[in-house]
């Protein structure tokens, strides 16, 4: 029997167990996966922006800065459990063409920086970090920690 697959949408966090597969497609957004092998749980978030412009509580994954605490809470993990977690980060591509000299805020780059900073702050070990480059990324995670990160073909 094939595993049940769930697509994680922009600003969403999904938690899986029992062989389920989580997947998403990313551009400048960043995908953050947490794997908790001992509990046989894993989570995937599809984050749109690094930080809110003003303090705005978000219960999902719109902002990288607020996502990790939500994921831990939904997985049932506490700060005492973070040493058992593994993180996989992908996406954060530079999806806009143009003169890079005029782009002061490249959202994909900022999303990746924020993801790394927030995971380090929570002392969660990053086992894979795959920046998107200048193309989209497909990310897939299964419970045994098996994951795939695939670059999508560039379109003209």
UniProtKB/Swiss-Prot annotation:
Its EC number is 3.5.1.44. Keywords: Chemotaxis, Hydrolase. Pfam families: CheD. It is an enzyme of class 3 (hydrolase). The keyword Transmembrane does not apply. The keyword Oxidoreductase does not apply. Probably deamidates glutamine residues to glutamate on methyl-accepting chemotaxis receptors (MCPs), playing an important role in chemotaxis. Belongs to the CheD family. This is Probable chemoreceptor glutamine deamidase CheD. The gene is cheD.
């Amino acid at each position: 029997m094939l595993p049940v697959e769930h697509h994680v949408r922009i600003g969403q966090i999904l938690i899986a167990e029992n062989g389920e597969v989580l997947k998403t497609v990313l551009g400048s957004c960043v995908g953050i996966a947490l794997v908790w092998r001992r509990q046989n749980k894993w989570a995937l978030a599809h984050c749109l922006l690094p930080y809110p412009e003003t303090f705005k509580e978000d219960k999902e994954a719109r902002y990288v800065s607020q996502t990790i605490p939500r994921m831990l809470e939904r997985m049932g993990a506490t700060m005492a459990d973070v040493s058992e977690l593994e993180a996989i980060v992908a996406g954060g591509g530079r999806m806009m063409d143009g003169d890079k000299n005029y782009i002061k805020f490249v959202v994909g780059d900022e999303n990746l920086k924020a993801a790394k900073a927030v995971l380090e702050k929570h002392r969660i070990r990053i086992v894979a970090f795959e920046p998107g480059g200048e193309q989209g990324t497909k990310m897939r995670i299964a419970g045994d920690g098996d994951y795939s990160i695939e670059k999508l073909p560039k379109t003209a």
